[in-house]
């Protein structure tokens, strides 16, 4: 990671999101809704990622869709289910925040951005005590991603594909000031930002990092969308 001050970039945005999967698109929509100037960078020519490989089921506690389905659920129930399922090893504050925002996030995706979700009322996911899961009609994550990409486009958020982020910059204070990306023709471009959101998966596709941080899983097979996530290592 190299040093570069924010004032030296020819092009800069307020919020820069790396990754145009469900996480990145949702983050971009939220930041845009808060009044920020947002840009999304996607490594692939066509966004897909793990979202498109998944069944697209999203857990939530206390959504309006659950209430319409007659399901008595709440954020506290989801929080406790997640805590027990993780055998108490999860970060309690993160679980609390995620569960607490889950219901309103589902409502927001459906009502503000047209994501076609419904509550799966006849299925209780293993480890859950009530039907927390929401999904699209096809039960495929690709359908959710298509609707999120449409919402990003409808809001006029810039989404640049075939843009592989290869390095991060920080200023003298240590704050991230921008990124370096590489285009398919090999040309490098630098882009400044006030806030950087890395929504480009974890490091499951990077055997070196798995061996370092989760040595007991060093020999495990990874079946997700391949990313090495050097961005995490750079940070």
What are these regions (language model features)?
Residues 2-7, 36-37, 43-158, 164, ...:
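Conserved N-terminal/central alpha/beta ligand/cofactor-binding core
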Residues 24-27, 206-207:
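Short glycine/serine/threonine-rich phosphate/pyrophosphate-binding segments
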Residues 27-28, 106, 233:
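Generic hydrophobic/aromatic pocket-lining and core-packing "Φ" positions
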Residues 136-194, 233-235:
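Helical element adjacent to the flavin cofactor pocket in flavoenzyme catalytic cores
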């Amino acid at each position: 990671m190299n040093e570069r001050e924010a004032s030296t970039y020819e092009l800069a945005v307020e919020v820069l999101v790396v990754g145009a999967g469900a996480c990145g698109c949702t983050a971009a929509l939220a930041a845009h809704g808060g009044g920020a100037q947002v840009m999304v960078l996607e490594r692939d020519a066509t966004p897909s990622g793990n979202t498109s490989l998944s069944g697209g089921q999203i857990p939530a506690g206390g959504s309006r869709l659950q209430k319409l389905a007659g399901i008595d659920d709440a954020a506290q129930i989801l929080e406790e289910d997640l805590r027990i399922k993780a055998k108490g090893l999860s970060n309690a504050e993160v679980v609390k925040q995620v569960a607490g925002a889950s219901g309103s996030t589902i409502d927001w995706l459906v009502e503000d951005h047209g994501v076609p979700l419904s509550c799966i009322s006849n299925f209780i996911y293993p480890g859950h005590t009530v039907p927390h899961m929401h999904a699209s009609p096809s039960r495929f994550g690709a359908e959710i991603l298509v609707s999120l990409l449409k919402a990003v486009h409808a809001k006029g958020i810039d989404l640049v594909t075939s843009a592989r982020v290869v390095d991060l910059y920080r200023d003298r204070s240590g704050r991230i000031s921008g990124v370096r990306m590489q285009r398919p023709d090999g040309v490098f471009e630098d882009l400044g930002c006030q806030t950087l959101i890395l929504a480009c998966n974890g490091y499951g596709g990077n055997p070196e990092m798995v061996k370092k941080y989760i040595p007991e899983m060093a020999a495990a097979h990874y079946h997700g969308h391949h990313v090495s996530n050097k961005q995490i290592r750079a940070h």
